[in-house]
Each structure stands twice: as structure tokens, then as C-alpha cells.
């Protein structure tokens, strides 16, 4: 499998502060395989994952809808928070998108800011791998 391209702006801070409702901070696992080619820590606040957070995907893309539902189901199981899976790409929340990249179809970028998480993959499979990395950043037991 080819190495994954990603830029993880603020991911570590997001992982530690992902759930603002918790009084106890749990550590996230960052044992990501394959090892990212690049990690960039950015400035700014952490993204807060809460009930009603939107998981957005491009309208009409069934594979991306399945990716979005997979993420929402995982978060529900782990945290009890119910995420909204919606077609569209505008607004705050988690945005899943594809920018075709024949050279690295399984590559992805993961960018985290205070109001949005963007997973941009070279294909739907790349987005899926980005979701796996995001899952690793959610502290266990939240």
C-alpha cells in the first residue's frame, strides 16, 4: 500500500480536547499505520464533537454516503453522540470529499480547525483511510 499523504493541522490538540463535555481528559492513540508522510500542527482551537455535529459528503456519491454513515455509527458507539449525516459540503462539521489523484488514490489529507474537519481523499478509499486516522484521534472511553 502506498504511503498516505496528510496534513494534520491541530489533530493532536483536537484529539485531547475533542469532547469538551468531559471532565476527565483521555489520551488518544496516534499509532497510525502506515506512518504519515507529513504532520503539520497548526494554530487555533480544537474541533468539538457533539450531538448533532454534521458529517457532510458530496451529494449523489453513494460510496461517500457509506463512509459518512460509517463514521457516524462509530462515533455513536464510542461516545453516545448522534451525528447528522447530510448530503452537501457547506457549513460547520466534518466534511468528506474526493479530489481524484491517480498517483495516490488511497492518499488523503486531514485538516482540523475549530469549526471544521476536512478529510480529502484521492478516492473514496482514501477518504475511508482518513476516517480511520480521525477515529484514532478520538480518545477512548469518551
Regions found by a protein language model. Give the residues of each.
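Contiguous, structured surface segment used for ligand recognition
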Residues: 22-142
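Bacterial N-terminal signal peptides that target proteins for export
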Residues: 1-9
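Repetitive helical segments and hydrophobic/amphipathic motifs
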Residues: 12-13
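C-terminal motif of bacterial Sec signal peptides marking the signal peptidase cleavage site
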Residues: 18-20
Amino acid at each position: 500500500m502506498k504511503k498516505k499523504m496528510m496534513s494534520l493541522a491541530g489533530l493532536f490538540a483536537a484529539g485531547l480536547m475533542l469532547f469538551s463535555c468531559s471532565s476527565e481528559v483521555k489520551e488518544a492513540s496516534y499509532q497510525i499505520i502506515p506512518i504519515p508522510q507529513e504532520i503539520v500542527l497548526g494554530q487555533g482551537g480544537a474541533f468539538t464533537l457533539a450531538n448533532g455535529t454534521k458529517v457532510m459528503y458530496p451529494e449523489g456519491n453513494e460510496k461517500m454516503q457509506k463512509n459518512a454513515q460509517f463514521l457516524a455509527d462509530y462515533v455513536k458507539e464510542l461516545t453516545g453522540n448522534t451525528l447528522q449525516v447530510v448530503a452537501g459540503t457547506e457549513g460547520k462539521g466534518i466534511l468528506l470529499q474526493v479530489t481524484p489523484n491517480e498517483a495516490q488514490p488511497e492518499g488523503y489529507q486531514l485538516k482540523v480547525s475549530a469549526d471544521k474537519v476536512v478529510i480529502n481523499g484521492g478516492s473514496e478509499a482514501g477518504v475511508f483511510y482518513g476516517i480511520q486516522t480521525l477515529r484514532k484521534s478520538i480518545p477512548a472511553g469518551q
